[in-house]
């Protein structure tokens, strides 16, 4: 699975949220100023080439659907992120965000609750 560019990732997030869509639907999801239709169409073509979306021809346009689940993408690239930036230590990652004041004490409690629930299952 290839890593997506920032633009591709943004478009892919819209496709995941829409579940199936035309390029015009994706363009409509952007805030003003919206990118040109042709730019979004080009990005979607790249996503199709990379295997992230499937296209079904309907008349003279295409209906796009995700070919890769969002959870699968997250699992693959978050694992790489933790490996590359935090020596494969999730503890180091959480510590970093806590020190940078990106996580509150309540956030950390929620994380602990999630971990404990995961152990029970």
Tell what function each PLM region has.
Residues 4-7, 58-77:
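Short, cationic-aromatic polyanion-contact patches
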Residues 41-45:
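Short, hydrophobic-biased segments on the C-terminal half of alpha helices
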Residues 9-14, 25:
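Pre-recognition alpha-helix immediately N-terminal to the DNA-recognition helix
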Residues 77-120:
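Amphipathic alpha-helical dimerization/coiled-coil segments
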Residues 51:
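Glycine-centered, phosphate/nucleic-acid-interacting loop/turn motifs that mediate DNA/RNA or nucleotide
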Residues 21-30:
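Short acidic, hydrophobic short linear motifs in intrinsically disordered regions
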Residues 13-20, 98:
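Short, locally clustered residues in the helix-turn-helix/winged-helix DNA-binding domain
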């Amino acid at each position: 699975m290839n890593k997506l560019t920032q633009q591709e990732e943004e478009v892919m997030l819209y496709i995941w949220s829409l579940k199936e869509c035309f390029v015009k639907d994706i363009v409509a999801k952007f805030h003003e100023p919206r990118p040109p239709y042709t730019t979004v169409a080009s990005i979607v073509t790249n996503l199709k080439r990379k295997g992230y979306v499937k296209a079904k021809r309907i008349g003279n346009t295409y209906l796009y659907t995700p070919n890769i689940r969002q959870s699968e993408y997250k699992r693959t690239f978050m694992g790489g992120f933790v490996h590359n930036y935090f020596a494969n230590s999730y503890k180091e990652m959480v510590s970093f965000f806590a020190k940078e004041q990106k996580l509150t004490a309540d956030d950390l409690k929620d994380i602990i609750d999630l971990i404990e629930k995961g152990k029970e299952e």
